[in-house]
Structures are given as C-alpha cells and as structure tokens.
Amino acid sequence: DLAVTNYGSNNISVFRNTSTSGTVSFATKVDFSTGLNPLTVTVNDLDNDGKLDFAVANYWGSSISIFRNTATANASFTSASFATPTTLSALANPRSIKAADFDGNGKVDLAICYVTNNYVSVFRNTSTTGSISYATKADFATGNLGTWLAIGDLNGDAKTDIAVTNQTDNTVSVFQNTSTSGTVSFSTQVVLS
C-alpha cells in the first residue's frame, strides 16, 4: 500500500495495493485528516498488533498525527480502517520523522527533526496492543536547521543511532544511542563537517 502526505490539503492519502503478478494497480485513495501541512510520514507497527500504522509530521501544526490501523485482512479499505488519530505535541516546524525501537524494549519509538529548531526529538513508545501512546519527548541539540534525519546502527552495538543534516552549517550531527530498556538517551552530538 502507499501513504502520501498532502501538504496543502491537511490530509494523508492511503492507496490500497491491488496489484497482481506483472500488473501494478491501486484502489481509489482514502483520505485521512491530519494537522496543519503534513510533510513526511513513517509507517511501522506502533502498537505491536501486527498491523502497520503511520505517523505524520505536521509542519505548521507543530505536531505528529498517529493513525492506528484497525483494518482486517483482505477487507475493503475505508475511512474506518484507521482509528481517530492520536496527536503528539512537537516543537515548531517538524520536518523529517523516523520510527525505530531506540530503547530496545520491543516497542517502536519516533524521532523527528525540525526546520526552525536546532533539536531532534525522540518520543518513547508506551503503547499496549490496540492502544497507541507515547511519553513526553526528549530533545537533543543539533546544529543549525537540522532538516533531514537518518537512523541506523552506526557503531555495531545493535542500537539504532541518529544522524541529522544541518542545512545552515553544512554539517551532520551524529547521536550515539546510549539507551536502556524503558529509557531513551543519546550521547552529545558528534559534528561532521
């Protein structure tokens, strides 16, 4: 399936994949209202129920809209396929959003960076199966105008680290993951230029 943000329409469109072998096709889109000016989306199972949910960074809304998937397998896809969104407060102008289990507790956390704030925020997942919730964000200082976010294990310790591109500085901020189960923490940024 495809999930696409619509910045000017304040919604996200989801296209159900109806492809068969050798033929690409999608069902008519279903739109879901978000906060102001959704910019990026990440897709993952956020409540460990085996279904893919999505989280949307709302640029002018200074928020994240989280949509819990309630669809049943092979059913027709409708506006009822996702629960009413959960909204998380963020700093102004969130841009890039990624999902990963940063603290190793088996739940998918969220990381987001901002265009006008020099921070990356991490929201620790406190969800239970069928109910999505997140703890208050933890903020980590970046360089100037951290515009894009990448995640991955950069040092081979089996923990997901964070890298942020800093537009004004022409640098990259790298954050080594020092989290333990239930607690999200990262080292002070290492700046690459």
Predicted segment positions?
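Calcium-coordinating acidic loop motifs
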Residues: 18-20, 45-51, 59, 70-72, ...
